[in-house]
Amino acid sequence: MAHKKAGGSSRNGRDSESKRLGVKKFGGEAVLAGNIIIRQRGTKWHPGANVGMGKDHTLFALQAGAVSFAKKANGRTYVSVNPILEAAE
């Protein structure tokens, strides 16, 4: 018996929802404690000073300050938060 498969439109046409990964706060940008700096899968960026890492590898600020990125000799990129020192009144 001759069978002909359908055009394919009913079998295709699905896609996963985007995960909105990437850098949320860039170098020099001010952050508050708890602000998400980077959403990532795995450790493309590593936590530096005043930065914590969640169980899904999200990097977040532990302290208010300015975000900075630094590449170390081991080839890893570290994200740090430099606290903004306010003048004593």
From Swiss-Prot:
PROSITE patterns noted in UniProt: RIBOSOMAL_L27
Cellular compartments per GO CC: cytosolic large ribosomal subunit
InterPro entries in the cross-refs: Ribosomal_bL27 (IPR001684), Ribosomal_bL27_CS (IPR018261)
Family per similarity comment: Belongs to the bacterial ribosomal protein bL27 family.
PANTHER family, A to Z: LARGE RIBOSOMAL SUBUNIT PROTEIN BL27M (PTHR15893:SF0), RIBOSOMAL PROTEIN L27 (PTHR15893)
Region: Disordered, residue numbers: 1-21
Lineage of producing organism: Bacteria, Pseudomonadati, Pseudomonadota, Alphaproteobacteria, Hyphomicrobiales
Protein name, as recorded: Large ribosomal subunit protein bL27
A molecular-function term among this protein's GO annotations: structural constituent of ribosome
Domain of life the protein comes from: Bacteria
SUPFAM superfamilies: Ribosomal L27 protein-like (SSF110324)
Keyword terms: Ribonucleoprotein, Ribosomal protein
Protein source organism: Chelativorans sp. (strain BNC1)
Gene label: rpmA
Gene Ontology biological process terms, A to Z: translation
